[in-house]
Amino acid sequence: MARVKRGVVAHAKHKKVLEQAKGFYGRRKNTIRTAKAAVDKAGQYAYRDRKVRKRAFRSLWIQRINAGARLEGFTYSQFIHGLDVAGIVMDRKVLADIAGNDPAAFKAIADKVRAALA
């Protein structure tokens, strides 16, 4: 049976890990053992934070809608309920954008909500 030497494969694996660890601080960028641990942990953080990002943006949109709604005399929950009653189907991302960038359009939506709740 032929002898298997894996130096080339090991070098390629190490190179891959060190490329992923580029930009890390201290030994984490150039010592294979610490770099591998740091890259693994970075992957865990990245996976977790892809989930957290969705929550964080939804929270931000709700805050912006709430601010716009309060200028029109509603609380956030009253405003969302009014949208439902009025039959206006619009997601929070779009509502937050309208509240921040187009106050006239948001006022028109708020007037429709006010009419639906009256």
Swiss-Prot record:
Citing just one GO molecular function, the answer is: structural constituent of ribosome
- InterPro entries, sorted: Ribosomal_bL20 (IPR005813), RIBOSOMAL_L20_CS (IPR049946), Ribosomal_protein_bL20_C (IPR035566)
Entry's Gene Ontology cellular component terms: ribonucleoprotein complex; ribosome
Instruction: Output the SUPFAM superfamilies linked to this UniProt entry.
Output: Ribosomal protein L20
Instruction: State if Ribosomal protein is listed as a keyword.
Output: yes
- In Gene Ontology terms, what is a biological process of this protein? translation
Q: Which Gene3D superfamilies match?
A: 6.10.160.10, Ribosomal protein L20
Origin, by domain of life? Bacteria
Keyword field contains tRNA processing: no
Q: Pfam families of this UniProt entry? A: Ribosomal_L20
Q: Which UniProt keywords apply?
A: Ribonucleoprotein, Ribosomal protein, RNA-binding, rRNA-binding
Q: Which PANTHER family does this UniProt record tie to the protein?
A: 39S RIBOSOMAL PROTEIN L20
Q: Function of this protein?
A: Binds directly to 23S ribosomal RNA and is necessary for the in vitro assembly process of the 50S ribosomal subunit. It is not involved in the protein synthesizing functions of that subunit.
The record's family statement is: Belongs to the bacterial ribosomal protein bL20 family.
Q: What is this protein called?
A: Large ribosomal subunit protein bL20
Q: Which organism is it from?
A: Caulobacter vibrioides (strain NA1000 / CB15N)
